[in-house]
Amino acid sequence: DKMLSTGKYDVLAVVHNETSTGVMSNLDEISDLLSSKYPEVIWLVDAVSSMAGIKIEVDKLGIDFILSSTQKAWGLPAGFSICAVSDKIIKRSKVMKNKGYFFDIEVYEKYFNKFQTPSTPSIPHLFALREVLNIIKKEGINNRWKRHKEMRDYVIDWVQNNGQKLFSENGCHSNTITCIENTQEWNIDNIYNTLLLKGFRMDRASDAIFRVPDFFINRTTLDDAVFKGRVVATQLAREGDKKVIDELLGK
């Protein structure tokens, strides 16, 4: 609010769901601020790791441009983007200069109205996306939002019951990615390498934090992963890293 009140800015860019930290921005609060005080400001939202996993009412919120990618909550390989634009940003695009070609919304609008694309897209992604949309339709969109939140809560309970700490503050926890502070100083490299041999791929960004994805899985698959993780933990204990494993098992 302080920065926008200067009148120097005509665009606000927001990361809805920060993948690295598991922090989710409150879009409702931002929407209320913009609609009440700065309706002329263009609002851009990065929803790469939230779209299809967290409910985002684009029109109701007044988002002008929202962009996502398929490798997160959509459950598809990387290499394909999905976006939605408002009438306001289309009108703004028509009077802008030096837009280039590949990011010119007018070009996309022209082809969109003919049910075409400016260039050949990734056809396998389109077929895969159609299948995911069928899965979402079968599950029910509200059930999908509910499932992701339940998975988030399930992981948070596990974190708290095992003596670790969430990186994000209360009220800012993401529904699709949980970031955990390694307050007990577990040997992340050791855990990573052992889990990898058992078919689990774990984030190894640093020893300070590690992350658990809450999207495109359900309680059954997580229960199975936790059980197998305990089996791996037992094996690690036999191999000598007992301190790490006692902590993993909550001892």
Predicted segments, located by residue:
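A short linear hydrophobic-aromatic micro-motif
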Residues: 164-168, 200-205
